[in-house]
Every structure is written in structure tokens, then in C-alpha cells.
């Protein structure tokens, strides 16, 4: 739980809320400054940005990344790219830009720079679940429907392969 005390907030109230959240709600508490984005968003955005930048470099496919960043490491089944599709690619870009602007260090700021291929996706209207095309896209087939995945190098949707993980 993130608690953001204002200048006018009584220290006793902050302490009470910390204690209440920890004991009654079972929550870990972080005292934060009043800055844009939640702490978890800033940390999560950084982690997602690292994946987005490394994926094409190492030749991973969207579905491969989701297989290794989901339940196998204790994260939700939606993993990385299904989560980004749920959030909305335009929303993620907004949050990442916002987080990057709050960072003063040049190298850290570079970590929040949106990859060109993701900027193109958003510019083309690929927003994720909002409009049915993000990193995943459902298509109708003769046998019903199937999913395609976005290939950032080819800049097109492709069938997901069942490649072995390295």
C-alpha cells in the first residue's frame, strides 16, 4: 500500500494508517512522495521497458516472453504482453513517458524511451484489448478462431510458434 502524506497531514495519522494497513489488512506499506504514477507503476514500467527493448535484440517472440514471465516466475498468467494488451498500449506509452520525464539521470531516462516499433503500433491504432489488436490478435478461421502475435521485426502479425525456449 502506498501512503502519500501531504504537508498538512498529522504524523500520528500516517503512523496509524501504516499500522492499520500492516496489521488489519496484511499490506506492506511504502511512504511515497506525491509524484505522478504509483511506485509499483514506475517499477513495473521499467521492467516492461527492459523486456520490450531486449525482445527483438535476442529474437524472442511475444508468446515466448509470456511463457517465461508469467506463472512460471510467480506472476499472473497474463504475463507481460497480455497484461500490456489489457492495460492498453496507448496507456502504457503515456505512463512510460510520464515516468521517464520524472527521472533526472540521463541513462535512467533512456530506459523509459519507447521503442520505435511500439510507437508505430500505437500510431497505427494497435491499442490492445481496446480494439482487439495489440501484441495478440484474434482472427476468425475456417475452424473457429485463433490468435496471432505481433512480430516487432517483421512489423506484422504471425502465427505463434512453439519454439523451445533457450
Regions found by a protein language model. Name each.
Residues 1-166:
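N-terminal glycine-rich phosphate-binding loop for ADP-containing cofactors
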